[in-house]
Curated annotation (Swiss-Prot):
This is Pyridoxine/pyridoxamine 5'-phosphate oxidase. The lineage of its organism: Bacteria, Pseudomonadati, Pseudomonadota, Alphaproteobacteria, Acetobacterales. GO terms for biological process: pyridoxine biosynthetic process. Homodimer. InterPro entries: Pyridox_Oxase, Pyridox_Oxase_CS, Pyridox_Oxase_N, Pyridoxamine_oxidase_dimer_C, Split_barrel_FMN-bd. FMN binds at residues 49-54, 64-65, 70-71, 93, 128-129, 173, 183.
């Protein structure tokens, strides 16, 4: 019914993820590593926003944030997350669910140092997710931080770090004609994975 290859159930999910991201890097005009990150309060009130994936290995998927932002506070209180990658040009998506753990201070320091100077200054000047009476207030704080550090090193603030998502489930979705889509989910089984194809 279609010449689109079916998802390979024998594939390692991390290898398949890497292959799909590689395809997205060739076809998506902007931010192929963009993902929706859903968190929830302890009583189950969800929130979601777009972030950029900043690292992936056999341990999990890494992103960074202000720990005092809404997502940071929710993850500290309820350390579980759902991620969604959607590549419209490829008609594909990947969903990932699992608990999170904090990245090490060394990992956070290394990534923070790799950011542009203005991004580092902004991380210090911003009370992320807090009310802001006037944009000029933030710009004045940014200027003050800029003057404080000058051309010197800019330290990572204690309230800025990262999380690693430890995947318990990774679902791959491939569009097919007539909404007869192809879906497969890998779920953790000890140190291995169980894989199941799903009805569309």
């Amino acid at each position: 019914m279609s010449d689109i290859p079916l998802i390979d159930l024998k594939a390692d999910p991390f290898a398949l993820f890497a292959a799909w991201v590689s395809d997205a890097e060739k076809s998506e005009p902007n931010d192929p590593n963009a993902m929706a990150v859903a968190t929830a309060t302890p009583d189950g009130r969800p929130s979601v926003r777009m972030l950029l994936l900043k690292g992936v290995d056999e341990r999990g998927f890494v992103f960074y944030t202000n720990l005092e932002s809404r997502k940071g506070r929710e993850l500290l209180a309820n350390p579980h997350v759902a991620l969604l990658f959607h590549w419209k040009s490829l008609r594909r998506q990947i969903r990932i669910e699992g608990p999170v753990e904090a990245v090490s201070a060394a990992e956070a320091d290394a990534y923070f140092a790799s950011r542009s100077r203005m991004s580092r200054l902004g991380a210090i000047a911003s009370d992320q997710s807090r009310p802001l009476d006037d944009r000029s207030t933030f710009e004045e704080r940014l200027k003050a931080v800029d003057e404080k550090y000058g051309d010197g090193p800019i330290p990572r603030p204690a309230n800025w770090s990262g999380f690693r998502v430890l995947p318990e489930a990774i679902e791959f979705w491939q569009d097919r004609p007539y909404r007869l889509h192809d879906r497969a989910v890998w779920t953790r089984d000890g140190n291995g994975w169980n894989v199941t194809r799903l009805y569309p």
